[in-house]
Regions:
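Conserved N-terminal phosphate-binding loop of PLP-dependent enzymes in the Aspartate aminotransferase
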Residues: 1-286
């Protein structure tokens, strides 16, 4: 919005976000999130956000109006169930934003920094955002977040125009640089691709052994999901009892995000535990 006013000299303010999305826990990011369960108790929310179905070109074209200034999207909807759009969706968004003079904002907090096998999840699609948010793997466990932008968009933030208490602190910045150096120079991205493929193939084999329990396996790199025919919590609890930490999102979706340095041997161990958990929790599933 500041870019719209200070750089573009316009008055547009509306941000289009996606249904089923998740963007955070501040008032603005709760508003941007496309899941009602995260909004309860926080009314009144921030005005100027509207939601459209994810990976739906027609719905988005109809939604863009005279007050729209930006489109906010996760390249993969993580909290929403590891929902991957079609390969042409992100290029479509880039083309639409260029045509309508909108800013394209990618939330890569969960899928960025190597998670999908490339440094950023958008890279295989030949497009780039105007603004991107990053966190989680950015500093190897040290709390850090970053909002990065093109030079033209970043010009809207002049010194002192916006800040955060710990923004740019030396500890987090040093940790971020160290983590990026390891990721880029010590084969971490290659391992993400190798172990990610191994994980995907293994999950598909497990799914074939449990056709009554598994609807679908989906994901990219080291963010994978198994959509079950029934509640996922019993499987999560059984896996935990055997030392495997996974989680369940969207009630039926098991989500797998192992460390970026996970080995194929560790993936095999995980798959064995998962296989046993699906077998032992089959009674009453569905």
């Amino acid at each position: 919005r500041r870019y719209e006013r200070d750089i573009r000299k316009g008055k547009r303010f509306e941000i289009l976000a996606m249904e089923n999305s998740f963007h955070g826990r501040t008032l603005a990011t709760v508003t941007a999130t496309g899941q009602e369960k995260f909004k309860k108790g926080f009314d009144p929310l921030v005005p100027g956000f509207r939601h459209v179905p994810f990976d739906d070109r027609d719905a988005l074209l109809k939604a863009v109006g005279d007050e729209t200034c930006a489109i906010l999207v996760e390249p993969i909807q993580g909290e929403g169930g590891v929902i991957c759009p079609g390969d042409d969706y992100l290029p479509f968004l880039r083309s639409l934003c260029d045509e309508r003079e909108l800013l394209l904002v990618f939330d890569e907090v969960q899928v960025g920094i190597g998670r999908t096998g490339t440094l950023f999840a958008y890279e295989p699609f030949g497009v780039a955002p105007d603004i991107m948010t990053l966190a989680k793997g950015l500093a190897g466990g040290i709390p850090i977040g970053a909002t990065v932008a093109t030079e033209r968009v970043a010009a809207a933030f002049t010194p002192g125009s916006h800040a955060s208490t710990f923004g740019g602190n030396p500890l987090a910045a040093a940790a971020g640089l160290a983590a990026l150096e390891v990721i880029l120079e010590e084969g971490v991205l290659e391992n993400c691709r190798r172990s990610g493929l191994h994980l995907r193939q293994g999950l598909e084999r497990v799914a074939l052994r449990h056709p009554d329990r598994v609807r679908e396996v989906r994901g990219r790199g080291l963010i994978q999901a198994m959509d079950l025919t029934g509640p996922g919590t019993p499987v999560v609890e059984t896996c935990m009892s055997e030392g495997l930490l996974i989680n369940c999102t969207a009630e039926t979706v098991l989500r797998f995000l192992p460390p970026l340095i996970v080995t194929t041997e560790e993936v095999d161990e995980m798959l064995e535990i998962l296989d046993r958990a699906l077998s032992s929790t089959c009674q009453g599933a569905g």
